[in-house]
A protein has these predicted regions:
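Short glycine/acidic-enriched loop and turn motifs that connect beta-strands
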Residues: 13-16, 61-66, 115-118
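Residue-level detector of Asp-centered blade-edge/turn motifs that repeat once per structural unit
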Residues: 2-3, 49-53, 102-106
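Asp-box/WD-like beta-propeller blade repeats and closely related beta-sheet repeat scaffolds
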Residues: 83-139
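An edge-strand/N-cap motif at the start of beta-rich repeat modules
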Residues: 1-14, 22-23
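Short loop/turn segments immediately following beta-strands, especially the blade-tip
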Residues: 22-30, 75-82, 121-132
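Beta-rich catalytic cores
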Residues: 16, 42-45, 96
Length: 139
């Protein structure tokens, strides 16, 4: 892509407004072009791109940010179109899941739950999917 960079933005909204949108950014001109939109997700919030740039992870709140457990979803990214394909999702066992990051090896994902005051981790499989929660700390 040379001076083109693929970026992903979450809308942090529910219903028809809830989406993760893929853009191509032209670094020379600063022009953004929407290339894809994934809207089968409620309340997408924080995003993390895996080091392989082939997988994206999103926190989201299917029950709204103040009710029910937050979730972390795993997606495969189509490198040509920017389309997302959901691999799986796991409960974050807390409310307002507000942070997510992938370790530099791409083998683990960490998250934080703001309202319920907890952090945890999931292993990441070879296919990019999330395994069962491997660590959880309640503060």
């Amino acid at each position: 892509m040379g001076n083109q960079h693929r970026i992903f933005v979450s809308s942090c909204a529910s219903g028809a407004e809830g989406a993760i949108i893929a853009f191509d950014l032209d670094a020379e001109t600063g022009r953004l072009e929407q290339v894809n939109r994934y809207d089968d997700i409620e309340g997408p919030f924080y995003l993390a791109l895996a080091p392989d740039r082939a997988h994206l992870y999103s926190t989201h709140a299917p029950s709204g940010f103040e009710g029910g457990d937050g979730m972390v979803a795993a997606f495969a990214i189509d490198s040509e179109s920017g389309a997302l394909r959901k691999l799986n999702e796991q409960s974050a066992a807390g409310t307002t899941t507000c942070y997510v990051d992938v370790d530099p090896t791409g083998k683990a994902l960490v998250f934080a739950n703001y309202s319920s005051g907890s952090v945890g981790a999931f292993p990441i499989g070879a296919d990019g999917s999330l395994g069962e929660m491997s660590s959880f700390v309640q503060h």
